[in-house]
């Protein structure tokens, strides 16, 4: 089975890239998952990767999130073997540090995301169509993906985004302009939008 390589912002050199996870075999497979964690201006960040790219960025620490992440991987057909290895996550850490310093507006790290085709379509739209310093509503995203009636489903996909900050679900706001629905908490959403210059 070939992996579909989708480059976000195809004409821009410094943008995140999604490497879609292949369809999973019925038989569970073991997968080495590399991780690292560090303190950021927004609190502790946990980055996880497989050999093909970054699979998750979470707010928090491995000791608190390991069970949740293990269950998520098992649901996606992978039995995780967790290995603390900063070499595998170093590029992501560097880019995130540059982002928080205001030196990076588009991420280049390679992503390997687990999700349904619809979810990946929504996540790709977030990467392609909401640049740094801008926001869109859930309805806007539904129109972008060619399914204007799927606002609720878009909300569900945004809520399940596994890669915080890089896949910018924090840039999706309510139709009325209010900050709603962010897994990291509205305080983090507000912090990120202020950092990007959308909010004062």
Task: Name these PLM-found stretches.
Residues 36, 161-163:
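A generic hydrophobic-helix recognition signal that picks specific residues
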Residues 148-151, 192:
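LysM (lysin motif) carbohydrate-binding repeats in extracellular/periplasmic proteins that recognize
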Residues 152-161:
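Regulatory, non-catalytic segments
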Residues 166:
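Major-groove DNA-recognition helix of helix-turn-helix-type DNA-binding domains
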Residues 171-196:
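Long, intrinsically disordered, low-complexity Ser/Thr/Pro-rich regulatory/activation regions
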